[in-house]
UniProtKB/Swiss-Prot annotation:
Name used for this protein in its record: Proteasome subunit beta type-1-A
A Pfam short name: Proteasome
GO terms of biological process kind: proteolysis involved in protein catabolic process
InterPro entries given in the database record: Ntn_hydrolases_N (IPR029055), Proteasome_bsu_CS (IPR016050), Proteasome_sua/b (IPR001353), Proteasome_suB-type (IPR023333)
Cell location: Cytoplasm; Nucleus
Recorded GO CC terms: cytoplasm; nucleus; proteasome core complex; proteasome core complex, beta-subunit complex
Organism of derivation: Carassius auratus
DNA repair keyword on record: no
Cysteine disulfide links: none
Family the entry assigns: Belongs to the peptidase T1B family.
Function: Non-catalytic component of the proteasome, a multicatalytic proteinase complex which is characterized by its ability to cleave peptides with Arg, Phe, Tyr, Leu, and Glu adjacent to the leaving group at neutral or slightly basic pH. The proteasome has an ATP-dependent proteolytic activity.
Length: 238
């Protein structure tokens, strides 16, 4: 073992380092793996979209890792943050949904899934899952619904929501194009499914130009009463 000269005193012995206080040992179980998720609710449909890049720092671990997970025939969840927690959380949700279906002989509604997820996250509030969740689906009346969460369980129903590394770029665009925020003398026409899909493609293409953690491909889950349809759109890969 090589010992530097600075570590030895004048007598050739190792220096004795004394600490003036307690030594704090660092424990950092989390990592940020990037990625962006987005959900939009319409009159009779909902969209949940995400990019497929899984990265950490300047390294790309995978170019084919979507962050949209199908829960039921009318509900999809988008998760971004620490990928390990995303996988663990979605497995817990899927297990709870199977137990519910076996007990009640029916699938859980989107609103009930959102309430259940809130209790799961709050139960881990002292050691939370590092995951930002957005649920998109149809409610009991067949209308589109979006539920957004923070990591410890607070949630609310929205018409549109973006989360993840590029959310600060996507949310203002959604506010302008869907919410018509701070706009005067503008006719607020209902959002059609075709326009919503095109808007999602446009905002992700713009985000991939500016956010290094977003890119490779875009996966869009289109939820209607007929079921869930998926579209894949290529994004820039650098």
């Amino acid at each position: 073992m090589m010992i530097s000269a600075q570590a030895c005193g004048a007598n050739g012995r190792m220096k004795d380092y004394h600490y003036t206080g307690p030594v704090e040992h660092k424990f950092s179980p989390y990592a940020f793996n990037g990625g962006t998720v987005l959900a939009v609710a319409g009159e009779d449909f909902a969209l949940v979209a995400s990019d497929t890049r899984l990265s950490e720092g300047y390294s790309i671990h995978s170019r084919d890792s979507p962050k949209c997970y199908k829960l039921t025939d009318t509900t999809v969840i988008g998760c971004s943050g620490f990928h390990g927690d995303c996988l663990t959380l979605t497995k817990i949700i899927e297990a709870r949904l199977k137990m519910y279906k076996h007990s009640n002989n029916k699938s859980m509604t989107s609103g009930a899934i959102a309430a259940m997820l809130s209790t799961i996250l709050y139960g881990r509030r002292f050691f939370p899952y590092y995951v930002y969740n957005i649920i998109g689906g149809l409610d009991e009346e067949g209308r589109g619904a979006v539920y957004s969460f923070d990591p410890v369980g607070s949630y609310q129903r929205d018409t549109y929501k973006a989360g993840g590394s590029a959310s600060a770029m996507l949310q203002p665009l959604l506010d302008n194009q869907i919410g018509f925020k701070n706009m005067e003398n503008v006719e607020q026409v209902p959002l059609s499914q075709e326009k919503a899909v095109q808007l999602v493609k446009d905002v992700f293409i713009s985000a991939a130009e500016r956010d290094v953690y977003t890119g490779d491909a875009l996966k869009i889950c289109i939820i209607t009463k007929e079921g869930i349809r998926e579209e894949i759109v290529p994004l820039r890969k650098d």
